[in-house]
Amino acid sequence: LTAQIVSRIEQLIDAGKLRPGQRLPSIRKLAAHHGISYHTAVTAYEQLVASGRISAQQGRGFFIDSHAQPRQPGMSSVASESENSPLGSFWRLFHGSPELMKLGCGWLPPAWRDTQALARVIRRTANFSKSALVEYGDPLGYLPLRQQLCLHLQRKLSLILEPQQVLTTLGATHALDLLIRLLVAPGDHVLVDDPCNSNLVQLLKLRGAQVIGIPRRIDGPDLAFFAETLAKWPVKAFFINSMLHNPTGSSISASNAFQLLRLAHLHDLTIVEDDVYADFGNGHSNRLAMLDGLERVIYVGSFSKTLSASLRVGYVVGPARLIARLADLKLLTMVAVPGFCERFVSIILGDGTYQRHLVSVQHKLRTHQAMALEAFRQWGWEAFCEPQGGMFVWVRHPQVTNPEAFVQEGVEKGIVLVPGSAFSADGQPSPWFRINVAHFDATGASVLFKR
């Protein structure tokens, strides 16, 4: 109830119906009007004061703060200030009101996560190892977890691994950052999918890399363009989502994968396979790490997407010598992943909770994907492909010629999108939109997408 009252008052401020300096009802009147307790009314006003939307004046009551500025629906002050930055569209996803339909986001809805099971494992973790609460962990990562990851990847990718080939990280973004620091020097030419994960492009540019986008087709990278680029430039590495590609949802074919690896071998190219959405798939796999046997492919995975964004644990798999160098870099930059988080993942992998959770999530994703694809088809939208699982579909409409204006229209209708240009390797305009089917509701989405 508190959140609802706060949200309602913020909406009135943003709509200009409550103006700077205007007096608000007393706490008792607010409680009586909304049928809430005195304590709830007090808490609501306290939150609004803390956020700077209203001010309290001793003996007079509560007033709309004279410095409060109307904001776009669902937007926090941080998001409003940052919306014109290169990553501005993504601020809406992180700071928008819970009432918004966040179709542009890259995570599962909170309701899809078994928070009760997670809470049980958290309690078990705390009881199992008190030292994990206060001590530094191993820079390579918690050994039992790395051993479990070896078994996990043997089942998934048929890879025979030793624990010294696995390094834990603070999620996949941290893994990519470590690899970029180790493999890429300023001025190096680096390849990425186009479109691709926008965080990756920003990390590479921060390093001073020359980023070249390889157009993504339904069956994988454009091999002709890939070959031409390798012949033209001394390329250092190729960062790729082979399966359940972000943002298109496409997966590489066996033929495309074999030809890509052949060209990589010919040009002595290192490939970094970012596979954070692996466990959302339907089982079919042409993963490069599996086909290559980790000769020139470095594999990145994560549990942040599937389990919890707060308990961030990712990992890198590669040759032991490379992993040792990454561990040194990790030690310099952050020492170790929090031991509590590593033990949490270790327990949840070992007791069957993780697999049960995946079965449930995969079923929901299949159902929502089918609903979303059918709805977009009826509304006249074109889908890039029909994904083999995962949470994304990539769509466009011939009548939507101004994507940025369409995104703004979505905000006004309570739907948060990210324009396709945000996923472009070089920021070029794009008519496409990434849709997270896990957040899709046909009735709510129709107010924007039904043309």
Positions of PLM-derived features:
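Conserved glycine-rich beta-strand-loop-beta hairpin in the small C-terminal domain of fold type I
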Residues: 363-373, 383-396, 411
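N-terminal small-domain helix-loop-helix segment of the aminotransferase-like
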Residues: 78-171, 350-353, 416
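Short, Asp-centered acidic motifs that coordinate Mg2+ and/or phosphate
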Residues: 236-237, 269-270, 298, 313
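N-terminal basic, amphipathic alpha-helical segments
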Residues: 1-123, 327, 331-337, 349, ...
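Conserved core of the PLP fold type I
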Residues: 132-267, 279-292
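Conserved core segment of the aminotransferase class I/II
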Residues: 118, 293-363
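Short beta-strand "wing" residues that participate in macromolecule-binding interfaces
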Residues: 20, 56, 161, 417-418
